[in-house]
Amino acid sequence: MFAVIKTGGKQYRVAANDVITIGKLEGDAGTAVTFGEVLLYADGDGATKVGAPTVAGVSVAGEIVAQTRGPKVIAFKKRRRQNSRRKRGHRQDFTVVRVTGISAA
């Protein structure tokens, strides 16, 4: 059994006990989260439900494992022969979520 969920403008294929890294969600480690935007649901018997745009009555439950940050990305601009340069760093915030279950009504 698996589902395709949408969160943070991206789509993720998840199953029970999967650990996924998604865009930042508010909450501390151990907080329960629910994803209501399920785009596709497939049970173990081969039956598949495709949403238009979402599947009604299906939700994915998860638990926040950690709040992390990605690697540092450097944006560096330089104008030659002018002693002019600009260096700027960025680190994206991520949330690690463990999927606890998929419930279908």
Swiss-Prot record:
Alphabetized InterPro entries for the sequence: bL21-like, bL21-like_sf, Ribosomal_bL21
Pfam families: Ribosomal_L21p (PF00829)
Cytoplasm recorded as keyword: no
Keywords: Ribonucleoprotein, Ribosomal protein, RNA-binding, rRNA-binding
An example Gene Ontology CC term for this record: ribosome
Family assignment from sequence similarity: Belongs to the bacterial ribosomal protein bL21 family.
Known partners and oligomeric status: Part of the 50S ribosomal subunit. Contacts protein L20.
Cited function: This protein binds to 23S rRNA in the presence of protein L20.
Stated name of the protein: Large ribosomal subunit protein bL21
Organism of origin: Methylobacterium sp. (strain 4-46)
Organism lineage: Bacteria, Pseudomonadati, Pseudomonadota, Alphaproteobacteria, Hyphomicrobiales
